[in-house]
Amino acid sequence: MTKLEICCFSVGCALIAQQAGADRIELCASPAEGGLTPSFGTLKQAIEQLTIPVYPIVRPRGGDFCYSHSDFEVMKNDVAQIRDMGFMGVVFGVLDEEGHIDLPRMQQLMALSGDMAVTFHRAFDMCFNPYVALDQLTQLGVKRILTSGQQQNAELGLPLLKELHQASQGPIIMAGAGVRMSNIHKFIDIGLTEVHSSASRIMLSTMTYRKAGVTMSADNEVDEFSHYCVDGGVVEVMKGMLSLTLFE
């Protein structure tokens, strides 16, 4: 059966996803940045409260995936901490200036990962050549690649996703970015064994007093009195749709 990974931005949301039948959690902070390394407090709660596999992301900042020396030192420390806390897997990715896999740095992070399964995240979608990248990640021992098929969303990337799935001699190709109830069957149809979704809904703030004219974000369009959370009902339906493939 195709596995369902849910991207969660809090332990509370991860617990909802677990209860709804998710197979695995990708744990992140900062949805507006596309996912950053979660705090120590979040990691500690996750390892104590969740029973399904949790893969924290290691991404020290938003923006591109070509990191300074300081950024990379932070990443190494985070990978080591996540390993020592007992997580089953970890998510990261590093590119060089030319958009290729940064092999020396990836080798260091892979070594620090120990026995954890490694997911190479959507830095893959920014790679210069996905076929070369797939071969390099195979040689590195990466367990899976999260990708939209180098498109803005995974449905547009279906042709490349299918090619990568058929070509892979190692890493699991996991579709992510815009995977929803309405299109999940398309990823099953091309043979993928894992999909990734946020399955989210907007939660309104419980605050009744709202200070006018003051925001914390540099983006004035952001609604700071709402946040994203996993929709357990959506996770249940998606998991049910994946389960049906067992009987087809």
Swiss-Prot record:
GO terms for molecular function: copper ion binding. GO terms for cellular component: cytoplasm. SUPFAM superfamilies: CutC-like. It is found in: Cytoplasm. Pfam families: CutC. Keywords: Cytoplasm. Belongs to the CutC family. This is PF03932 family protein CutC. It comes from Photorhabdus laumondii subsp. laumondii (strain DSM 15139 / CIP 105565 / TT01). The gene is cutC.
